[in-house]
Amino acid sequence: MIKTATVAMFGLLLVATGASARHRRSSDAEPGVFDYYLLSLSWSPAFCLSDPGAAECNGPRRFGFIVHGLWPQNESGWPENCNVHQPVPDTVVSGISDIMPARGLVYHEWSAHGTCSGLGVADYFALVRSAYGRINIPASLSGPQQAVEQPPAAILAAFMRANPKLSPASTVVSCSGQGAPRLREVHICLDRSLNPRNCSADAARGQCRAASLIVPPIR
């Protein structure tokens, strides 16, 4: 289902915002037993507006979409915090930092979700990179230099043009904020071979219902 300072706080804030949109959580989950994956792409400029002191918001690189996580999902509910105890090596953290730029986020995603994948640490984050690499970011969202207001359907359409195998049933645009909501994340449902598939009803509930949203620029 759909989830959502210091480097560590990056992961905690994303988890807090995402979890509010999720529903039934599985307990006592067995690693590797799940139905599909959800790739969560977070729009970093929106995060940086809410937490400008975060490390990834003040470095030399400005990010657009980053990977929030690759989450094992079930048709109803989702596994989390499986009983796997394997530390994340520094080499894995540095190796994935171009798409997951916060150490705390990497640690959290492994502990909460990677442990339920049935994979080891290195293989899980290799799968994260592979999933991200299969998605083409629309040109209009690759480096916008000014804020754009548009309906969520326009963002969905842009992703489908850039990725013809995606559909409205496999892709969810989420937003957050009062008044004029901001683009928060794009969630893409993938089968266990990383091919697009329909999202479950729980995952689809995260769809932004606003008439329009703001896409903050990359600065």
Where are each of the predicted segments found?
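Domain-level detector of nuclease and nuclease-like folds
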Residues: 38-40, 51-219
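N-terminal module-boundary/linker segments of secreted carbohydrate-active enzymes
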Residues: 22-48
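Bacterial N-terminal signal peptides
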Residues: 8-14
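Bacterial N-terminal signal peptides that target proteins for export
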Residues: 1-7
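N-terminal signal peptide c-region/cleavage motif recognized by signal peptidases
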Residues: 16-18
